[in-house]
């Protein structure tokens, strides 16, 4: 019986070692794939300024620039990126409002990654207010985010960028045709 037990534990150790080797190879290949996707996509994506804080009152659908604060680098340039990963940390909804906290992963304009903590608070009263805040996370480890989800989101952003550019180009073409058709005397 002891001999069977020893063989069993040896087999477990052997399988664990093989599993770790396979897992390490998967991580390496996933990281190479992600790096290649970022390298290709970063030239096609339209990156947006990342807000630090914004407040919305009375359920208005419009944001006013004085109600939004953005992140800036040490040179005063706005940080730009796209949200490519999200992990919900907490969520609470009650009779008067609610709040949620997420960990977010952004692909930055320079191809680097930045992890943020996102907090949203809202109320349901007649004078509704929604408050959204982001802070740069202390832990910048991106391994907790799903690589397949990140790649899917990057591809969607490239598609969104294409749609936006085509729409804007078509608007400009219309404007150009209109201007050309006007007679200037």
Segments the model singles out, each with a brief description of its role:
Residues 1-58, 62, 181-185:
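Leu/Val/Ala/Ile-rich N-terminal alpha-helices, chiefly Sec-type signal peptides and the beginnings
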Residues 42-127:
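Amphipathic, interaction-prone secondary-structure segments
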Residues 6, 12, 38, 83, ...:
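Generic low-complexity, intrinsically disordered sequence content enriched
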Residues 24, 31, 58-59, 75, ...:
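Detector for Asparagine
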Residues 4, 14, 33, 61, ...:
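Arginine residue identity/basic-tract feature
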Residues 1, 9, 29-31, 64-65, ...:
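Serine/threonine-rich low-complexity intrinsically disordered regions
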Residues 120-184:
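Mid-to-C-terminal oligomerization/interaction "stalk" domains of large proteins
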């Amino acid at each position: 019986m002891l001999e069977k037990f020893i063989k069993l534990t040896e087999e477990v150790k052997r399988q664990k070692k093989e599993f770790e080797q396979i897992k390490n190879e998967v991580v390496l290949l996933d990281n190479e794939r992600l790096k290649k996707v970022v390298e290709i996509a970063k030239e096609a994506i339209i990156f947006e300024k990342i807000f630090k804080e914004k407040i919305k009152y009375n359920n208005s659908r419009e944001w006013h620039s004085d109600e939004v604060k953005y992140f800036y680098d040490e040179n005063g340039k706005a940080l730009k990126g796209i949200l490519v990963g999200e992990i919900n940390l907490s969520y609470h909804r009650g009779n008067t409002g609610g709040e949620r906290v997420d960990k977010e992963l952004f692909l930055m304009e320079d191809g680097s990654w930045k992890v943020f903590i996102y907090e949203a608070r809202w109320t349901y009263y007649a004078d509704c207010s929604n408050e959204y805040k982001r802070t740069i996370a202390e832990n910048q480890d991106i391994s907790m985010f799903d690589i397949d989800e990140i790649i899917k989101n990057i591809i969607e952003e490239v598609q969104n960028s294409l749609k936006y550019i085509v729409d804007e180009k078509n608007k400009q073409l219309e404007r150009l045709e209109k201007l050309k058709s006007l007679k200037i005397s």
